[in-house]
C-alpha cells in the first residue's frame, strides 16, 4: 500500500520511519539511519574547492530548474555532497544512482536501467545524480564491444530528453566520450582543499565535537596537508563514533593519517 503511492526511495524512507517509531514505542532506541543521501553534519559550499562559484551555480539552477552538470575531481572532494545540497536548494527529491545500481551482466539490461533511472527522476520531479558516470561514458572510439557503445548512446539519449537537473560525478575525466562531454552544460572541477578551507573546516569540526579550537601549531600542521578533502573530515567523524577524538591535536593527527595513505603528499600547500 505504501509503495503504490511513493517511489522507491520515498518508500524506503517511509518504512524506515515506521520501523523506527515502532521500535521507540516498544521501548527500544530509534533505528539508526544510514541514509546515503544525507549531507555531512558540517556542509558549506565555501569549504569545497571548485573552479566555479558553487553557490552562484545553485542560484542559477534554482531559477532555471534545468541543467546538466559534470562534476569531476579526486575522491572525497565533495562532488556527491554538492549534488545532495543542490537538491535541497532546489527543494526537490534526490535520486542517487551508482554504477553498481545500473550495471548488469545481462545484455541490454544496463541500458534499460539507465532509461528507468531517468524515468523515475522525471516522474518524481527529482534531481538525478549518477555517481561514477565514467562507467557509462567511455570514449566510443575505444570500444571493443557493441554493448559499450549502446550504453553510451542510451545515456546520451536520456540526457538529451531530460528536462530536469541532472548531475554526473566522476573521479576519472580522462577517456570520457567527447560527444558526452559536449552534452553537459557545465563541467566543474573539484580539487583538494585550500589551506584556508582546511583551517575553516578544522575549526568547524572542533566546535562540532566540543573540542578547544586548534592552536597555531595544529593550524600549521593542517595547512601542510596537500591532499586533504572534506571526505577525510567525514571519515574521521565516523571514526569518532567508536574511537573518540578528545582534542584538536588528535583530530589533526587523524586527518594526517587519512592523507598519509594517498599519493602525492610531499608538496607544500599555501593560501590560494
Regions found by a protein language model. Name each.
Residues 1-139, 147-272:
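AAA+ P-loop ATPase motor domain of ring mechanoenzymes
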Amino acid at each position: 500500500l505504501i509503495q503504490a503511492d511513493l517511489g522507491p526511495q520515498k518508500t524506503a524512507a517511509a518504512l524506515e520511519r515506521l520501523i523506527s517509531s515502532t521500535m521507540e514505542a516498544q521501548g527500544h532506541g530509534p533505528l539508526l539511519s544510514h541514509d546515503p543521501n544525507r549531507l555531512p553534519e558540517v556542509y558549506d559550499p565555501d569549504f569545497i574547492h571548485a573552479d566555479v562559484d558553487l553557490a552562484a551555480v545553485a542560484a542559477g539552477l534554482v531559477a532555471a530548474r534545468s541543467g546538466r552538470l559534470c562534476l569531476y575531481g579526486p575522491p572525497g572532494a565533495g562532488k556527491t555532497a554538492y549534488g545532495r545540497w543542490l537538491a535541497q536548494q532546489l527543494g526537490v527529491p534526490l535520486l542517487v544512482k551508482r554504477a553498481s545500481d545500473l550495471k548488469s551482466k545481462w545484455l541490454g539490461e544496463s541500458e534499460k536501467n539507465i532509461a528507468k533511472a531517468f524515468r523515475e527522476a522525471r516522474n518524481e520531479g527529482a534531481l538525478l545524480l549518477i555517481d561514477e558516470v565514467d562507467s557509462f561514458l567511455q570514449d566510443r572510439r575505444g570500444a571493443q564491444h557493441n554493448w559499450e557503445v549502446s550504453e553510451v548512446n542510451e545515456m546520451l539519449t536520456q540526457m538529451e530528453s531530460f528536462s530536469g537537473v541532472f548531475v554526473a560525478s566522476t573521479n576519472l575525466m580522462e577517456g570520457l566520450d567527447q560527444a558526452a562531454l559536449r552534452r553537459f552544460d557545465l563541467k566543474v572541477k573539484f580539487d583538494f582543499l585550500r589551506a584556508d578551507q582546511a583551517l575553516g573546516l578544522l575549526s568547524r569540526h572542533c566546535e562540532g565535537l566540543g573540542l578547544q579550537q586548534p592552536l597555531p601549531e595544529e593550524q600549521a600542521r593542517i595547512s601542510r596537508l596537500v591532499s586533504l578533502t572534506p571526505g577525510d573530515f567525514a571519515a574521521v567523524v565516523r571514526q569518532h563514533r567508536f574511537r573518540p577524538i578528545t582534542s584538536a591535536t588528535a583530530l589533526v593527527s587523524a586527518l594526517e593519517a587519512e592523507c598519509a595513505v594517498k599519493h602525492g603528499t610531499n608538496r607544500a600547500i599555501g593560501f590560494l
